[in-house]
Swiss-Prot record:
Family note: Belongs to the CTP synthase family.
Stretches for region Amidoligase domain: 1-265
Misc. comment: CTPSs have evolved a hybrid strategy for distinguishing between UTP and CTP. The overlapping regions of the product feedback inhibitory and substrate sites recognize a common feature in both compounds, the triphosphate moiety. To differentiate isosteric substrate and product pyrimidine rings, an additional pocket far from the expected kinase/ligase catalytic site, specifically recognizes the cytosine and ribose portions of the product inhibitor.
Positions that bind Mg(2+): 70, 140
Protein name: CTP synthase
């Protein structure tokens, strides 16, 4: 097994995840099987209970793992499927070590950070890498060098560097190069970051610099000199117009070839599919506008996978999608704001929890339904679409979800039976892959090209089966079902009115977009042309 370990310095949020995903993409283009592990030094067991404002979206894996959004980038760039074990946290490591101590696995020894915690970290990394069957395992250590939380993980990979043959492991350090008011790039923070890393016994073989503009030659020379790496291994990862261009920028600087040389990997394969996808993305001329009506709109990372899936749909349809975030509560506070939705070619209601903003979202759904604007609802978005339909078409006054109103006379959305009495929040929802059977002749079947699908879920509430017949008698169709569970709702006489209980965005890939997103963008393009022809 070959390991590429990536650390970060100066500040968090530099883009280590995109860097590691880009390196992995380039290695995959050379014919290698690549997997990736994200280490998060927080004490949480997983990301499932974190606020989107704290940590961005919670990405859901096929096995139900609720993980850091970087794993979403890994899956999209590498076109692979990971598991919950690919996300290590301090909480998971300590939980396992304490469980072993309670069982007596350590035979009465004093349990310490070294060797017990570090051994557990190394064991987890190696087991995940081996099970994946990959040629190369990428390991990203979250946070910033110098953070106390990261110390056990850095010590563990230091030991791995000592234990593995030199041709089996390489260290890459991602750091920030800032510019002063005159535009000169300052390397001192990067130098100090590498110095701090070296104090921990780690010497990076490659330094990747994050900057607004391409790294100047003088800055590259300084970093090479003071950080003791060859100048050709100081790589500029400057801001790109789109993250999918980053693998190409890194490739042009020869990093992939040099990594292969260090790791003694040989390949004559050259897959240009990624380059062709980026070329298609950059050559789009048509543009449409999408409104995402949500409650976490102040931080776009809260809806990262949705934004990427929309982009994938745009690439496939040959058009650029301009996304506008609309705060749902503003629609509640000022109904006049609803009229502003007329400028958009499509409306999307994403998933979420809690009652805040739900009435505003339903106003947006009503607008889309009544004005025949292409609409996509996801998870809570589907539930709210059903509530809106029940209230305004079926005339079930005060219909609601028991999540928001336990005393509603018409609980068209109710808690999953198995969720009744569940006390713990973490890892207890209906999570991960579940299948669905699609109705023949439905929009769902046309989008997917099959009547059997598997998609990822994250929810506690569902459409109440007791109301299905009554709702369908008024024109809504539940075209996807998992036994007696409603997975998809659509209104056939609309341009595009599609809502899913599952999260299709988590399986969307560049070059292989999620069918609902592909269909939404196609409908938006058609609607836009119809409006222009009026």
């Amino acid at each position: 097994m070959k390991y590429i370990v990536v650390t970060g310095g100066v500040m968090s949020g530099l883009g280590k995840g995109i860097t590691i995903a880009s390196i992995g993409r380039n290695l995959k283009n050379k014919g290698y099987k690549v997997t990736a592990i994200k280490i998060d030094p927080y004490i949480n067991i997983d990301a499932g209970t974190m606020s989107p404002y704290q940590h961005g979206e919670v990405f859901v894996l096929r096995d139900g793992g609720e993980v850091d959004l970087d794993l979403g980038n890994y899956e999209r760039f590498l076109d692979t499927e990971l598991t919950r074990d690919h996300n290590l946290t301090t909480g998971k490591i300590y939980q396992e070590v304490i469980a072993k101590e309670r069982r007596g696995d350590y035979l009465g020894k004093t349990v310490q950070i070294i060797p017990h915690i570090t051994n557990e970290i190394k064991s987890r990394i190696r087991k995940v890498a081996a099970r994946s069957g990959a040629d190369v395992c990428l390991v990203e250590i979250g946070g910033t060098v110098g953070d106390i939380e990261s110390m056990p993980f850095l010590e563990a990979v230091r030991q791995m560097h000592r234990e593995e043959p030199s041709e089996n492991i390489v260290f890459i350090h991602v750091t920030l190069v800032m510019e002063d008011l005159q535009g000169e790039q300052k390397t001192k923070p990067s130098q100090h970051s590498v110095k701090e890393l070296r104090a921990l016994g780690l010497s990076p073989e490659v330094i990747v610099t994050r900057s607004k503009t391409p790294l100047q030659e003088s800055a590259k020379e300084k970093i090479a000199l003071f950080c003791d790496v060859p100048q050709e291994l100081v790589i500029s990862a400057h801001d790109a117009a789109d993250i999918y261009e980053v693998p190409l920028e890194i490739e042009e600087q020869g990093l992939t070839t040099r990594l292969m040389k260090h790791l003694k990997l040989e390949s004559s394969v050259e897959d240009n599919g990624w380059r062709e996808m980026v070329s298609r993305m950059k050559s789009t001329t048509e543009e449409v506008k999408l409104a995402i009506v949500g409650k976490y709109t102040n931080l776009e990372d809260s809806y990262l996978s949705i934004l990427e899936a929309v982009k994938h749909g745009g690439i496939d349809n040959g058009c650029k999608v301009e996304v506008n975030m609309v705060e749902a509560e503003t629609l509640e506070e000022d109904p006049a704001e609803i009229e502003k939705l007329r400028q958009f070619d499509g409306i999307l209601i994403p998933g979420g929890f809690g009652g805040r903003g739900t009435e505003g979202k339903m106003l947006a759904i009503k607008f889309a339904r009544e004005n025949d604007v292409p609409f996509l609802g996801i998870c809570l978005g589907m539930q709210l679409a059903v509530i809106e339909f029940a209230r305004n078409v079926v005339n079930l006054e005060n219909a609601n979800s028991t999540e928001f109103d336990e005393d509603t006379p018409y609980p068209v959305i109710d808690i999953l039976p198995e969720q009744t009495g569940v006390a713990d929040m973490g890892g207890t929802m209906r999570l991960g892959d579940y299948d669905a059977i699609l109705k023949d002749g439905s929009l769902a079947t046309k989008l997917y090209g099959t009547n059997y699908i598997v998609e990822r879920h994250r929810h506690r509430y569902e459409v109440n089966p007791e109301f299905v017949d009554r709702l369908e008698s008024f024109g809504i169709v539940f075209s996807g079902k998992n036994k007696n569970r409603m997975e998809i709702a659509e209104i056939p006489d609309k341009r595009f009115f599609f809502a899913s209980q599952f999260h299709p965005e988590f399986r969307s890939r560049p070059g292989r977009p999620s069918p609902p997103f592909k269909g939404l963008v196609r409908a938006m393009c058609k609607y836009n042309k119809e409006k222009e022809g009026q």
